């Protein structure tokens, strides 16, 4: 399931599994998280959306001659359209509040585990 947490890493994960022979390129279906809303990829601030778009575009280019049914390619394109179709960055304060709650319960620090998402706090 594609969420804010793994949005930067899904292409790398997909490619690694293909290269390891664990997965055929077209045997990939992206399920876009809908709830809770504050974990959705359309919550990312615009600058971070552009970074994710670049990663997905690069991955799609790599997949072009490998995904004969275009199933994975269409999934990544769909995720890109979903992410850019709506600006829900107004939910960033809810995201941070809920991450803080989870961090307190788990005795963890979300932004240490996902440092690439640290900049979200600047937009909350």
Name these PLM-found stretches:
Residues 1-124:
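Conserved C-terminal portion of the radical SAM core fold
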């Amino acid at each position: 399931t594609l969420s804010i947490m793994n949005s930067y890493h899904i292409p790398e994960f997909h490619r690694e599994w293909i290269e390891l022979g664990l997965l055929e390129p077209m045997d990939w279906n992206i399920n876009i998280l809908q709830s809770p809303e504050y974990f959705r990829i359309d919550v990312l601030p615009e600058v971070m959306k552009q970074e994710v778009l670049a990663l997905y575009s690069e991955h799609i280019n790599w997949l072009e001659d490998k995904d004969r049914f275009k199933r994975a390619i269409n999934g990544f394109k769909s995720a890109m359209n979903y992410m850019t179709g709506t600006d829900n960055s107004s939910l960033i304060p809810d995201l941070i509040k809920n991450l803080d709650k989870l961090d307190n319960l788990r005795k963890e620090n979300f932004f240490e585990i996902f440092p690439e998402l640290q900049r979200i706090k600047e937009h909350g």
